[in-house]
């Protein structure tokens, strides 16, 4: 028995399949095949009809659109609704006749509709209502023709508006139709002539909602879009108006560097401080150093940013930069070097410098770009950029804080600037702990300056914090000489901020440990930058450091030496983030070392923030390498900063 059934089943479709999914209750088993055949015969007709219907539908939709337009126009001109309805109705009919749209014949037979309601619905939602002619009311709606017409118009309108391929005209009307639909809805509810069977009504409402939703959704979207543009524009203007034009810089930075945030901040500072001033000056030598520095600073911006602003402001616009770069020292000292590191950056920045000329915005950006250019090492730059990006995100959180701080700070006059710078730096560096950082820093910064002179002592003094400062100071010393002041503070500040981290990180251990460190920085700086630039006392140390570092071919070697640096690229990316977080030693140390020499570890390790400073300083010297390295490491976090700093 079962086999027969099965055979039968294989031969014949299961009843539900036979009629398009609609079981045919009275059918005997014999009727199945027949039903199927009938269906097959009907199919071509169905297909054709659908095709024609689609075409007609397009035409109808066009008609409805025109009617809608007319209605809208009339509404605007204040005609009464009755008049509007009448006119629209006649207009619609006229158009229909003209377009050759069939009203009645084109609709498939009722039985087909019954059989395949789904299909019909999909093809022609507009056809749900029975056809109607102007004269006789709607076939199955007992409300007056005008009322029905309103429904139908609405329905079609509504359908067309949500249809997939709306004619272009539709957009214009969206608002009107939206309004209208609301009105219509109201009307419909008022005209409680059960104009539509409950089912139909439900459908209508659903559709209506859908339309409204999509309508308003798209409208909303559009609105947002424009709003954002507008707001963007507004922001831009505001920023332009801002004193330092920080924002522009900021903005630029963003784009320009990943760290936009920070950078920009820094940038701001840098630039902002003396945008115009900077422009020219910076542009020239500033560009060299400043920009380098700036760049550097920029990066740091977040961290050093504050400092910079001031420094920048400081008359040493360049200095500022330097400070920024802060790794002022580096900026100055390393002008050459920075150049290189910066060079890369600069390359990027190069354009900016001119921009800088532009002043506010540009300046900022210039520095940043410069910084970037300065970055000199492409890889470094790349790394830095990466870091920056990271930093940016990270800093975004701090940035505001930082930025605010920075902003204020910059305010300080140049004179104070420096110290500010220091403070800033520190704050920046401190980044994380901006509040405190800065102060100490500043203090340190001052000290740094003094120290700078002292260079060494500070170094020693750095002790914990001092190391950094020391380092920085130290570094600053060497560098400081040139930039000395700024750097000093910067350094100092950094350090200080760093110091915490620093210690461990601070190269102290790594480098030469603290003492060494102290020397180290100096040395590195000297070594790197100083050496070149300074030759200075640092030289011996530098040599030592160099030896230590292995080759101070700056970037490369250093990097090579430090395990961390060994695979800079990987490290940077992978390690970047963590380290900062984990500011501690490892990276620090490695960083340190890399940096340390220069700025020394302190920077690096220190905390990222510190790192910044530090290497910023150092980096400067070594900056690029260091930076990178540093950057890579802790820097990441700060690195970014740092990186930037250095990098830039």
Curated annotation (Swiss-Prot):
Coiled coil: none
Residues covered by the CWF21 domain: 55-98
InterPro entries named among the record's database cross-references: mRNA_splic_Cwf21_dom, SRRM3_cwf21, SRRM_C, SRRM_Domain-Containing
Basic residues: bias regions: 168-186, 199-211, 219-243, 381-409, 545-560
Biased composition range(s): Low complexity: 257-276, 289-317, 414-428, 461-471, 493-502, 579-648
A GO-annotated cellular component: nucleus
Lineage: superkingdom: Eukaryota
Gene3D superfamilies: 6.10.140.420
Extent of Basic and acidic residues compositional bias: 99-109, 525-544
Disordered: annotated span: 1-44, 99-139, 154-648
Function comment: May play a role in regulating breast cancer cell invasiveness. May be involved in RYBP-mediated breast cancer progression.
Family that this chain belongs to: Belongs to the CWC21 family.
PANTHER family, per database record: SERINE/ARGININE REPETITIVE MATRIX PROTEIN 3-RELATED, SERINE_ARGININE REPETITIVE MATRIX PROTEIN 3
The protein's name in its UniProt record: Serine/arginine repetitive matrix protein 3
Organism of provenance: Mus musculus (Mouse)
Designated gene of the protein: Srrm3
